[in-house]
Amino acid sequence: MKFEKFLKSVGAYGRVFERTNGDKWLVCDGVGMKIPTGVLELLGGGKVDHDMGKAVINAVISADTADDILHLSKAVLFDRDGKSGDICRVFETELDIELETHKVGIWNKEYGLLEKKDILTYLEIEDYPDEHGDVKTVKYIVVLDEHGETIGFIAGTYKI
C-alpha cells in the first residue's frame, strides 16, 4: 500500500493506534495502514480510543485470511455522468468452506492506495449493535505485503 499517498489524503484527520507490541497504525474513514518502521512523527497526534476502532484493527491483524484471496472482478460506475472517483472496484473470492462467492467493493480513491504487489484478502466483522439492537456485517479488504504481513485494510462500500 502507498503509505505516503494515504498520509497526504488523511492530513490532520487521521488517528494513530498503537498495539501492545509497538506497531502503529494510521486510521481514517474506514481505511487503515501500518505505519512503516522508521516513521517517527506524523502531523496528527490523535489516538484511536474508541472500542470499535481498536476491535477492527485487532480483528484485521489477527484474521486468518490464507484461503480468502480476492481478485478484481469488475469496475462499476453507478451514474453514467459520474467521475473517475465514483468508480467502484469490485473484488470477489470463493471461500472453500462455504463454496460461495463473496464480494466487496471499494471506491476508486481507496483503490489508488493499492500496489500491484499487494495481496488482497477478504474479512467480515460484525459491527456493534445500533440503537435498535441491529448488528450489521462490515466487509473489509485486508492488505498483505509480498511476505504475507498485514499492512492495511479498507472497509467495503455498502453499494455492492
What is each of the regions a protein language model found here?
Residues 1-22, 27-35:
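Intrinsically disordered, low-complexity linker/loop segments enriched in Gly/Pro
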Residues 21, 28-32, 36-38, 43-160:
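C-terminal functional regions that serve as terminal interaction/effector modules
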